[in-house]
């Protein structure tokens, strides 16, 4: 017979879904809750979640966007099968609530929870709600959104951000006395970003020794990107596939050049670092909309991908001296919502106390 309250987190695919889920999970673990994860075996959660001491159950589910006719015809059967798999996991473990953080797994998982009478809590990380969360919002007991506009009446709480990022020293304390080369941190998300990998080596060649760079290239790309820096005469580039201590990297940086996925935008703000965002080209401009509020308040610049060239990025970076970067960093920190993980965790506790 179980004693502690139990939460099943449904999240997968990318760091933008998984890391916020881990942040909420940590809040509840500190209150004595047991946490289990629902994910897919072939995405990053399969490796990442167990490293945080959380057991994970898998279901078989894939996205439908861009699939051929054959896959689309088979989709209803695959979705039903995924719902049944999720329901079996929930029946065995008996969670008191489930938290949907996005990714393909959330749809079948949310429906399975609803069918089982388990309260569903949703958090939408992006400024434009994904199709899965649009559906699940109709059956969820509580819906949160990171940015205004994803849902008409949902509470705006920001994105749950890792505690080591929120606890970084203030920008003034970190940056005011810095001297030497301006430090550029390039992050394309956990999967990297090809256009940043291709553009930055040439940009750094133009910028010269007044700048230093650390570059997260993404899985399988570090060797190629490092070779591009070498070919452009940039000998001191620090290139890695994945930055594990992201808080330390933010603390090191004077400027980020990055995509504007939901988690990245929230972490940039929480850390207090100025950024040049290059949004991924979604049809609905999701990433551009994620970053708009930081651009509007002077915390960031944005170059839309069709406008990104070696020249345009070089020019934008050269316009930002240390004082401008410090001002951007302070504006970013001032815009941050730092308690999303606690707010979501408290809502889950309150929901289960009513049962």
Curated annotation (Swiss-Prot):
GO (cellular component) term, any one: plasma membrane
Localization of this protein: Cell inner membrane
CDD domains: GT28_MurG (cd03785)
Pathway it works in: Cell wall biogenesis; peptidoglycan biosynthesis
Record field: catalytic activity: di-trans,octa-cis-undecaprenyl diphospho-N-acetyl-alpha-D-muramoyl-L-alanyl-D-glutamyl-meso-2,6-diaminopimeloyl-D-alanyl-D-alanine + UDP-N-acetyl-alpha-D-glucosamine = di-trans,octa-cis-undecaprenyl diphospho-[N-acetyl-alpha-D-glucosaminyl-(1->4)]-N-acetyl-alpha-D-muramoyl-L-alanyl-D-glutamyl-meso-2,6-diaminopimeloyl-D-alanyl-D-alanine + UDP + H(+)
Top-level EC class: transferase
Highest taxon of source: Bacteria
UniProt entry tagged with the keyword Cell membrane: yes
Tagged with keyword Cytoplasm: no
MF annotations from Gene Ontology: UDP-N-acetyl-D-glucosamine:N-acetylmuramoyl-L-alanyl-D-glutamyl-meso-2,6-diaminopimelyl-D-alanyl-D-alanine-diphosphoundecaprenol 4-beta-N-acetylglucosaminlytransferase activity; undecaprenyldiphospho-muramoylpentapeptide beta-N-acetylglucosaminyltransferase activity
Topological relation to the membrane, as annotated: Peripheral membrane protein
Alphabetical list of InterPro entries matching this protein: GlcNAc_MurG (IPR006009), Glyco_trans_28_C (IPR007235), GlycoTrans_28_N (IPR004276)
SUPFAM superfamilies the UniProt entry points to: UDP-Glycosyltransferase/glycogen phosphorylase
Protein residues bound to UDP-N-acetyl-alpha-D-glucosamine: 14-16, 126, 162, 190, 243, 262-267, 287
Main location: membrane
Entry EC number(s): 2.4.1.227
Short name of any one Pfam family annotated for the protein: Glyco_transf_28
Alphabetical GO biological process terms: carbohydrate metabolic process; cell division; cell wall organization; lipid glycosylation; peptidoglycan biosynthetic process; regulation of cell shape
Keywords on record: Cell cycle, Cell division, Cell inner membrane, Cell membrane, Cell shape, Cell wall biogenesis/degradation, Glycosyltransferase, Membrane, Peptidoglycan synthesis, Transferase
HAMAP family attached to this UniProt entry: MurG
UniProt record similarity statement: Belongs to the glycosyltransferase 28 family. MurG subfamily.
Function: Cell wall formation. Catalyzes the transfer of a GlcNAc subunit on undecaprenyl-pyrophosphoryl-MurNAc-pentapeptide (lipid intermediate I) to form undecaprenyl-pyrophosphoryl-MurNAc-(pentapeptide)GlcNAc (lipid intermediate II).
Protein name listed in UniProt: UDP-N-acetylglucosamine--N-acetylmuramyl-(pentapeptide) pyrophosphoryl-undecaprenol N-acetylglucosamine transferase
Gene name of this polypeptide: murG
